[in-house]
Amino acid sequence: PQPPTADALRSLPTDLIYGLPFQTSDSFARTLDRVNAVGPDRMSVFNYAHLPKTFKPQRRIDESQLPEPKEKLKILQMTAEKLSEAGYVYIGMDHFARPDDELAVAQREGTLYRNFQGYSTHSNCDLVGMGMTSIGSVGNCYAQNVRELDTYYEVIDKGQLPVFRGIKLNHDDEIRRGVITQLICHFELAFASIERQWNVDFRDYFEPEMAQLHNMVNDGLLEINDQGIYVTPGGQLLIRNICMVFDVYLKQHSGQRFSKVI
């Protein structure tokens, strides 16, 4: 890196989006080659979320020009291969990092954490949302600010908090958050750790979920034994799908999901 960058920043990240109109695995490979030449410390490769009902500019996009799920999965697989060859470590959930980046170090040391903003080396920190649409998290509560800029300024000018909705996690929410966090950060989960922390029998508590996971075992995405759940290398690219099994709210809000997995 250039000296000013090295002095001011600990890590230089880059975000890429796949699933855009006319993208193919070949065109995205060329993009990756150009980005790799720059050599960012971290790379996030996100699936494009096409939500024209929510975002008006997206209504200009012809949906027939978007790549099919099969092509997007091909792009994702190719991305993982090329970045691995370039020396990046797969952190999980679309994230890659250099081996000496603090995220990769935290992953090796078992201290990696993920909140709703992404992967972090700081676990269980309170977050204060600043600006419109931002989300804050304090303890077991989440709150989101208003989405419209004019409304945001209007509420601020009144000396009020611009929060328009929030949620307080119940006991089941916290257990599920712990399960998802372990899987999404470490690609494995020890039944005993959840049982000690929450005083539950894991396989009894999550009996329906365990039945779904066994289908993923048959697909080669997971291994399950008496001690816990282990995500295979092939399953790591689809860790979001695996964690979705434990999301009790997913079916309730299936029509409002923010982006397709593939």
Feature-to-residue mapping (PLM):
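C-terminal scaffold of the Radical SAM
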Residues: 1-203, 261-262
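Intrinsically disordered or highly flexible coil/loop and linker segments, enriched in small
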Residues: 162, 188-189, 222, 252-255
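Short, amphipathic alpha-helical interaction segments positioned at domain boundaries
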Residues: 236-262
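Minor-groove-contacting beta-hairpin "wing" of winged helix-turn-helix DNA-binding domains
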Residues: 228-232
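A short, conserved structural fragment
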Residues: 217-227
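Short amphipathic alpha-helical interaction segments
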Residues: 202-217
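Residues at alpha-helix caps and immediate loop-helix transition turns in enzyme cores, especially N-
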Residues: 27-28, 205-208, 242
